[in-house]
Amino acid sequence: MTDLKFTDLVEPVVIDKKTALRVTVLGGGSFGTAMANLATRNGCNTMIWIRDQKMADEINQTHFNQRYLPDFNLEPELKAVSDLELAVRDRDIIFVAIPSHSFREVVKQISPYITAQAIVSLTKGIEANTFSFMSDIIREELPEVPYGVLSGPNLAKEIVAGMPSGTVIASDSELVRYAVQHALHSALFRVFGSDDVHGVELGGALKNIYAIAMGMAAAYNIGENTKSMIITRALAEMSRFAVKLGANPLTFLGLSGVGDLFATCNSPLSRNYQIGYALGSGKTLDQAIKALGQTAEGINTIVQVRTRAIELDVYMPITNALYEVIFEGAPPLNIALALMKNGHRSDVEFVLPHHQV
């Protein structure tokens, strides 16, 4: 076994060969920290905004995020701040890595300080009650601001560890896509572009549902056949739902769709997978969330998507079975049983029109 790492095989970024973009990440969770660290490593003048002054001071002094990424040394040039105006005024890109339930509140708070900055969501969720995507919230609260969303198979610990990864920046603005690629693209982190904002955003939000399902099923030691069936039928559900909302189904064949789905459904590092595994092991929802200690967007997404799927008459048996297990006390094995019930005959439904039986 060799001790050679991927980071040993690539040349470090030569800072003076890059234009130093001024980048801020709002939110000091695991993914926000990973993106801030990556931008810093790429030569950007980077700040990370954290509500807790004590936590910000600790990051500046120790170069560790002890709460969310305690095993990884952060770039010493990364500056943590708790002053929101300082964090966003006169910056080039603002990445927002705030949980969906607080996303609108924070975007409202920064609005007085926003001029020409690009706002990019890192949040994979849907706002409760309104069914608004994070891009919708940005458009509503900051109507004149260029915006985008970043999504893909991006487990924070792997990114910070320097393992090769890829993501998608979706925006209607070519300038936003280019700026984000400039800030984050490196030899170990590829940033692909897309103009299907809602498609990319939906992939990131919906896959959290199926990560919970996979974690729950894994607690029962299911076989590889069942795992494969869950993932592929999950992709069918995602694309069915997305098409109803106007997204391009082909987006779901990329990194932000099947890529993110595969990574999240197969990794114990995934927060939503951990929640599902805990539920499948007999814990209550409150116990599972408390043990995780972080936000798992999938729980809220299940509620929002099930409600909208009923309104739109979209066939989503896995999502419906999950809702019944988590909120109505049905046995977790109902997830697997839901896949075996009569439904759509066709496999790839946006290629072959489906028929119900």
Curated annotation (Swiss-Prot):
Q: In which pathway does it act?
A: Membrane lipid metabolism; glycerophospholipid metabolism
One biological process term in Gene Ontology: carbohydrate metabolic process
Binding of NADPH: at which residues? Answer: 30-31, 51, 124, 156, 271, 297
Record's subcellular location: Cytoplasm
SUPFAM superfamilies tied to this protein: 6-phosphogluconate dehydrogenase C-terminal domain-like (SSF48179), NAD(P)-binding Rossmann-fold domains (SSF51735)
The record, for InterPro entries, names: 6-PGluconate_DH-like_C_sf (IPR008927), 6PGD_dom2 (IPR013328), G3P_DH_NAD-dep (IPR006168), G3P_DH_NAD-dep_C (IPR006109), G3P_DH_NAD-dep_N (IPR011128), NAD(P)-bd_dom_sf (IPR036291)
* Positions annotated as active site in the UniProt record: 207 (proton acceptor)
Enzyme Commission number(s) of this protein: 1.1.1.94
Identify the keywords attached in UniProt to this record, alphabetized: Cytoplasm, Lipid biosynthesis, Lipid metabolism, NAD, NADP, Nucleotide-binding, Oxidoreductase, Phospholipid biosynthesis, Phospholipid metabolism
Primary localization class, coarse: cytoplasm
| Coiled-coil residue windows | none
Q: Which Gene3D superfamilies does its entry note?
A: N-(1-d-carboxylethyl)-l-norvaline Dehydrogenase, domain 2 (1.10.1040.10), NAD(P)-binding Rossmann-like Domain (3.40.50.720)
Q: What class of enzyme is it?
A: oxidoreductase
Catalysed transformations (reactions) = sn-glycerol 3-phosphate + NAD(+) = dihydroxyacetone phosphate + NADH + H(+); sn-glycerol 3-phosphate + NADP(+) = dihydroxyacetone phosphate + NADPH + H(+)
Q: Which GO terms describe its cellular component?
A: cytosol
Q: Which residues bind sn-glycerol 3-phosphate?
A: 124, 152, 207, 260, 270-272
Q: Outline what the protein does.
A: Catalyzes the reduction of the glycolytic intermediate dihydroxyacetone phosphate (DHAP) to sn-glycerol 3-phosphate (G3P), the key precursor for phospholipid synthesis.
Family designation: Belongs to the NAD-dependent glycerol-3-phosphate dehydrogenase family.
Protein's name in the database: Glycerol-3-phosphate dehydrogenase [NAD(P)+]
Q: Could you tell me which species this protein originates from?
A: Acinetobacter baylyi (strain ATCC 33305 / BD413 / ADP1)
